[in-house]
């Protein structure tokens, strides 16, 4: 029974709780046993709050017995990325300098989830301040995809995605500024939602690209977490009121994809795509057609992702690197590399990226989606790859020499973030080596419910999410 419990979805757990067929105490114990078994293989956790989780589970059990009307996520165990502040629980930001930091207040999203009665299992790994597309740091080491320990889980929400797919909680809380939810969801075989700009608030939001969001094994579970955390907050100048549409109802849209118009793009003009990813994406398009969708391949003209990233974010990396060095903290090599490149970026280039670049990207997506309900792409140009180091990732993809894969991996997910658009990664198959590949569904600004509806119907039609790694 315990093995069955840790694979249950959040939706299923809620139904079992209310039918008095299982208790939060049983579920939390099963998930903690699973965590103890798999974490040495994937290294997804920074902090485990086992005692606290057991206490919360007992309290939840008592409230469920009382028969009171409780939120849908009540009693569901979950993890939180270690960039989100958790009052009274260590929050390291993936940085050795904050190894013992314990915040006094909760991040907005986590505070809203606590109000729903979720149970905290612990904090998941992230690179230093979430600044990389892989989850590796001096503090925690490297996090692996559950499908092949030793291969990267992606980043920066790598621990969150790896935990969910390994059976450590049905849902997780992550964040995404350029793919940090969607990339690890792709490399680990999870569902990850990057909401439209302003949907989920974060305090002191400075650019609108970054947002918190859910990771889960099903679109429905991710929609449940999204719905519980969305809505305006005065601490975020980009935040918007709650959607008039229910994300949960969108995920429960009945039927197949009949009538859905899909625009499809293989590489978003970035011209680098692993042959296995190309093959699986072609098959996914055929699956959509078989499910009733109309699919039309489109082109899109976007700036070079790596170059635009340097212009938009390079100064932040340079400033961070200088602060860490001044404090005697050794930098992870890829962060140092981006900081070094940033030294050659001019003020004019930074200004152009902010003033014109984002609008040009937004307009390019709008043109590509003319006459379509959603745009679909591969989530990542390559599947999971070996951890950096002596046996690091190849710099050849389909015969092309490319930048380090830990930087290239966000080339398909950065542009929708700069445009502020909703995007979701769902499992889209497995390559010849058994590694998962994600599909990215992108929608129009604030059309989050439409994206969720299409992604949920695709997921039900294919069933890739029903496979579990053999850990």
Model-derived regions, located:
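Glycine-rich, small-residue loops and helix-cap segments
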Residues: 20, 31, 75, 115, ...
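Residue-level signal for inorganic ion chemistry
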Residues: 31, 53, 222, 262, ...
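An N-terminal boundary/leader segment
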Residues: 1-55, 65, 290-292, 467-471
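Acidic/His- and Gly-rich active-site-bordering loop/insert found
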Residues: 55, 63-138
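Short helix-loop capping/hinge segments that flank enzyme active sites or metal/cofactor-binding pockets
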Residues: 73-93, 253-265, 314-366, 379-382, ...
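Acyltransferase
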Residues: 21-29, 58, 246-250, 275-299, ...
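Short glycine/serine-rich loop segments
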Residues: 103-233, 417-438
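A short helix-breaking turn/cap at a secondary-structure junction
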Residues: 191-283, 462-471
């Amino acid at each position: 029974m315990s093995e069955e419990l840790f694979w249950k979805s959040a939706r299923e757990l809620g139904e079992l709780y209310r039918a008095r067929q299982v208790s939060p105490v049983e579920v939390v114990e099963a998930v903690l046993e699973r965590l103890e078994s798999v974490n040495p293989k994937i290294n997804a956790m920074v902090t485990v709050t086992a005692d606290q989780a057991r206490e919360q589970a007992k309290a939840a059990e008592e409230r469920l017995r009382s028969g009171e009307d409780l939120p849908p996520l009540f009693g569901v165990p979950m993890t939180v990325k270690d960039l989100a502040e958790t009052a009274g629980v260590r929050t390291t930001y993936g940085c050795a300098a904050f190894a013992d930091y314990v915040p006094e207040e909760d991040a907005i999203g986590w505070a809203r989830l606590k109000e729903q009665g979720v149970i905290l299992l612990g904090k998941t790994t992230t690179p230093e301040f979430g600044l990389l597309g892989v989850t590796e740091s001096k503090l925690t080491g490297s996090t692996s995809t559950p499908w092949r320990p030793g291969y990267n889980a992606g980043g920066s929400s790598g621990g969150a995605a790896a935990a969910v797919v390994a059976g450590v909680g049905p849902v997780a809380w992550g964040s995404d500024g350029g793919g940090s939810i969607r990339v690890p969801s792709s490399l680990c075989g999870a569902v990850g939602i990057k909401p439209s700009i302003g949907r989920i608030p974060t305090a002191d939001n400075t650019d609108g690209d970054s947002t918190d969001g859910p990771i889960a094994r099903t679109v429905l579970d991710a929609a449940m977490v999204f719905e519980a955390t969305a809505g305006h907050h005065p601490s975020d100048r980009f935040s918007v009121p709650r959607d008039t549409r229910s994300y949960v109802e969108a995920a429960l849209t009945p039927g197949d994809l009949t009538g859905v118009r899909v625009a499809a793009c293989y590489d978003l003009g970035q011209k680098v795509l692993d042959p296995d990813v190309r093959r699986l994406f072609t098959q996914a398009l055929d699956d959509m057609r078989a499910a009733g969708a109309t699919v039309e391949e489109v082109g899109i003209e976007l700036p070079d992702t790596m170059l635009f990233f340097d212009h938009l974010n390079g100064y932040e990396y340079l400033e961070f690197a200088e602060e860490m060095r001044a404090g005697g903290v050794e930098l992870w090599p890829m962060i140092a590399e981006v900081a070094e490149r940033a030294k050659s970026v001019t003020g004019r280039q930074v200004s152009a990226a902010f003033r014109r670049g984002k609008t040009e990207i937004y307009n390019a997506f709008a043109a590509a989606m003319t006459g379509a309900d959603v745009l679909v792409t591969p989530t990542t140009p390559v599947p999971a790859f070996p951890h950096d180091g002596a046996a690091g990732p190849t710099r050849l993809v389909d015969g092309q020499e490319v930048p380090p894969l830990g930087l290239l991996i966000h080339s398909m997910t950065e542009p929708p973030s700069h445009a502020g658009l909703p995007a979701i990664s769902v499992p889209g198959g497995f390559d010849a080596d058994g590694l998962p590949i994600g599909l990215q569904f992108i929608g129009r600004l604030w059309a989050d419910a439409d994206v969720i509806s299409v992604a949920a119907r695709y997921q039900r039609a294919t069933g890739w999410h029903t496979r579990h790694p053999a850990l």
